[in-house]
C-alpha cells in the first residue's frame, strides 16, 4: 500500500514475540511467576508453544515516538496503549490518558445507541477528556 500510494514516512516496528530460549532462561532464573491460581510454567510448556507473545503497554510506543516514528506497526498490546502513548509522551495524566484510551479502543460501541462500525474522537485536557461521535 505504501509503495502503491508513493507514501514516505518513518515507521517503527515493535515485535511482541519472545524467543523460546529467552523465556526458558528467565524461567530458570525465577523471573516468571503465575498470574493467579494457575499451574507453574514449565520448560515443557515453553517447548510446546508454537508462539510466545507478550502483551506490551505504552512504553514501546512512546520510545518509537521519541525516535521520530510517524507510523507504528506493533504486535500484541494493551488496547488503550495506542491511544494513550502520545498523550503520555507529552506529559498528560496517566489515569486520564488510559481511561480515554480504554473507551476509544471500544469506539462507538460505548455510546448509546452502540455501534461497532462508527468512530469516536477523544480530546484530552489537563483534568478531563471529551468524547464525541
Model region roles, listed by residue range:
Residues 1, 49-56, 92-95:
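Catalytic cores of large soluble enzymes that bind and process phosphate-bearing ligands
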Amino acid at each position: 500500500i505504501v509503495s502503491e500510494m508513493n507514501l514516505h514516512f518513518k515507521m517503527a516496528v515493535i515485535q511482541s514475540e519472545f524467543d523460546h530460549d529467552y523465556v526458558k532462561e528467565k524461567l530458570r532464573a525465577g523471573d516468571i511467576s503465575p498470574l493467579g491460581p494457575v499451574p507453574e510454567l514449565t520448560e515443557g510448556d515453553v517447548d510446546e508453544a508454537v508462539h510466545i507473545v507478550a502483551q506490551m503497554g505504552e512504553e514501546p510506543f512512546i520510545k518509537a515516538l521519541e525516535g521520530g516514528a510517524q507510523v507504528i506497526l506493533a504486535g500484541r498490546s494493551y488496547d488503550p496503549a495506542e491511544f494513550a502513548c502520545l498523550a503520555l509522551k507529552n506529559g498528560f495524566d496517566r489515569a486520564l490518558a488510559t481511561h480515554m484510551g480504554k473507551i476509544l479502543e471500544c469506539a462507538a460501541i460505548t455510546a448509546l445507541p452502540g455501534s461497532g462500525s462508527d468512530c469516536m474522537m477523544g480530546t484530552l485536557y489537563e483534568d478531563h477528556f471529551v468524547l464525541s461521535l
